[in-house]
């Protein structure tokens, strides 16, 4: 499986998604620093929310195969600027988390924010209901993902 780096604001579900990907029981755990594993790089939301920490995200992106921009379906606004992932020089996917909490119109808006930020493919997930994760696994386990062939 490709190593995926999860970037998103605080409380958007990055760590829950990581726990779900590892088959662990879901429990709240505040990520205080970048957490490295063989298949994931989990980043604290503060690294996105504080521009002074962008350099840590850029440096860590070098160790990832794919960048995942994570945003909860009920997010009031996008923390990602258009073209946010350009300097990372990695394929980018978008992950809409907590998809069970929002209307289809709201999910569509969040999807458009992720695409503007650089996501080439967007997945809709719910760690609570364990939906959308299988599609993401299939994509990550593919020998050559479609967004890698641009």
From Swiss-Prot:
SUPFAM superfamilies named among the record's database cross-references: P-loop containing nucleoside triphosphate hydrolases (SSF52540)
MF-aspect GO terms: ATP binding; GTP binding
Pathway stated in the Swiss-Prot or TrEMBL entry: Polyol metabolism; 1,2-propanediol degradation
Free-text biotechnology note from the record: Can be used to target proteins to the BMC (tested with GFP).
One Pfam match: PduV-EutP
Keyword Nucleotide-binding: yes
Highest taxon listed in the record's lineage: Bacteria
Region (Targets protein to the BMC): 1-42
GO cellular component, one term: bacterial microcompartment
UniProt keyword terms in alphabetical order: Bacterial microcompartment, GTP-binding, Nucleotide-binding
Binding site for GTP: 8-15
Signal peptide: none
Cell compartments where the protein resides: Bacterial microcompartment
The protein's role, per its UniProt record: May play a role in the spatial distribution of the bacterial microcompartment (BMC) dedicated to 1,2-PD degradation, perhaps being involved in cytoskeleton dynamics; might bind GTP. This subunit is directly targeted to the BMC.
Assembly mode: Interacts with PduU, probably via the PduU beta-barrel which is predicted by modeling to be on the exterior of the BMC.
Domain characteristics, as noted in the entry: The N-terminus is required for targeting to the BMC; 42 residues target GFP to the BMC, although 98 residues give better targeting.
Similarity comment: family membership: Belongs to the EutP/PduV family.
Protein name: Propanediol utilization protein PduV
Species for this entry: Citrobacter freundii
Name of the coding gene: pduV
């Amino acid at each position: 499986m490709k190593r995926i780096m999860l970037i998103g604001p605080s409380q958007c579900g990055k760590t829950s998604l990581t726990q779900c990907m590892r088959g662990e029981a879901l429990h709240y755990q505040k990520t205080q620093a970048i957490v490295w594993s063989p298949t994931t790089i989990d980043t604290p939301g503060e690294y996105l929310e504080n521009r002074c920490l962008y350099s840590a995200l850029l440096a860590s992106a070098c160790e990832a195969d794919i960048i995942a921009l994570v945003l909860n379906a009920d997010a009031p606004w996008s923390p990602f600027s258009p073209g946010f992932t350009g300097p990372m020089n990695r394929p980018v996917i978008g992950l809409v988390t907590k998809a069970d909490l929002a209307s289809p119109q709201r999910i569509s808006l969040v999807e458009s924010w992720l695409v503007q930020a650089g996501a080439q493919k967007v997945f809709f997930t719910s760690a609570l209901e364990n939906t959308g994760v299988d599609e993401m696994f299939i994509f990550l386990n593919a020998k050559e993902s479609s967004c890698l062939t641009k």
